[in-house]
Design a protein with these regions (language model features):
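Proline-aspartate-enriched helix->loop->beta-strand connector
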Residues: 104-121, 136, 241-255
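Short helix-initiation/N-cap motifs at beta->coil->alpha
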Residues: 46, 95-106, 232-240
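A short, structured surface patch at a secondary-structure boundary
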Residues: 32-37, 58-111, 115-121, 227
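Extracytoplasmic substrate-binding proteins
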Residues: 49-50, 126-203, 228-229, 284-315
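His/Asp/Glu-enriched short active-site or ligand-binding loop at hydrolase and phosphoryl-transfer sites
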Residues: 209-236
């Protein structure tokens, strides 16, 4: 079975839940104290443009991952809108202005933001140009698809918002938590082969992750082997075929919760051609993680990693 489509990057439970049930997202651990932005700041956006921020009273993050950082820095009371991937409860009351990186210019401008934060995948490009043309400072932040990129992104967002010291503290705390989570992986144990599948059954999207998917970094940090990378997949995502699944030989299948739900839970998953012939399919070893946290690579990443360590190594 194959599919086309481009996934937003996708956290786990060895699962006996029904398709309607989903694992809880890791909670936000907001830094103590409310930082006072020191403005103006001038930063170099990831697209090379120099941006000056003079007012951070109405912040609009256009990705869930950036929203997570802004809220955890203690600036959530300044956020005026959210991306569809900002799934944590603290953001639930905010108006939705993007869907899968598709920005509504009219929706954004109606919120009167004083600074907009986006990443290189936010678009379409003409929408971003319109927002820049409106005079609102737009800062583009590099997306993070691996653990070493987490701290630099936290610091970049904090610097743009005039709270660099809080950014240093949050980055340091996150790095320490990630290190502690990695240390929980069993030493000397056989490493399970884990295949990350990006599933959107209602849209006919069935992809397997490979090198650069983001999931590969998490799987390896949790003491596993990314099955897609091990079988030689050089693209972040490749359409699933039964031959590819059988060749990947996963001991565990990792999915996002809504993706699992979209194919009818584990019962539906093992009916996808090739999955029942894998060790993971035969043993129904499936780990699903809440959609808004696995591939966010932010302050909650250590909690996701702890879940992976716990679930991937279950007998």
């Amino acid at each position: 079975m194959c599919a086309c489509g481009s996934p937003a990057r996708p956290p786990l439970a060895a699962t006996t839940r029904t398709p309607q049930e989903q694992p809880p997202a890791p909670p936000l651990e907001i830094l103590p104290g409310t930082p006072d932005p020191k403005l103006p700041t001038e930063v170099t956006s990831a697209d090379g443009k120099q941006v000056t921020i003079t007012d951070a009273s109405r912040i609009l993050p256009l990705t869930g991952a950036i929203s997570e950082v802004v809220f955890t820095l203690g600036l959530g009371n300044r956020v005026v809108g959210r991306d569809i991937a900002a799934t944590f409860p603290e953001a639930a009351h905010l108006p939705l202005v993007t869907r899968a990186h598709d920005v509504s210019v009219e929706g954004v401008l109606s919120l009167r933001p004083t600074v907009i934060l986006a990443d290189e995948e936010t678009g379409p490009p003409e929408a971003m140009e319109q927002l820049r043309g409106s005079g609102i400072p737009v800062v583009i932040v590099k997306p993070a698809w691996s653990l070493p990129e987490v701290a630099p992104r936290i610091k970049a967002i904090a610097q743009a918002l005039g709270v660099a010291e809080a950014g240093e503290r949050l980055a340091g705390r996150t790095e320490a938590q990630v290190k502690a989570a990695r240390a929980k992986a069993p030493a000397g144990a056989a490493k399970p082969r884990v295949a990350f599948l990006y599933l959107r059954g209602t849209a006919g999207v069935y992809l397997i992750g490979g090198k650069g998917s983001g999931a590969d970094s998490m799987i390896e940090a949790a003491g596993g082997v990314d099955a897609g990378t091990a079988m030689g997949l050089t693209k972040a995502f490749t359409p699933i075929t039964s031959e590819a699944l059988i060749a990947a030989r996963p001991d565990v299948i990792l999915v996002m919760s809504k993706g699992l739900q979209s194919v009818g839970g584990i019962d539906g998953l093992v009916r996808i051609q090739g999955i029942a012939q894998t060790p993971a399919g035969q043993r129904r070893r499936v780990v699903d993680v809440e959609d808004g946290s696995l591939l966010n690579f932010g302050p909650r990443t250590a909690r996701v990693l702890e879940t992976l360590v716990e679930r991937m190594h279950q007998a």
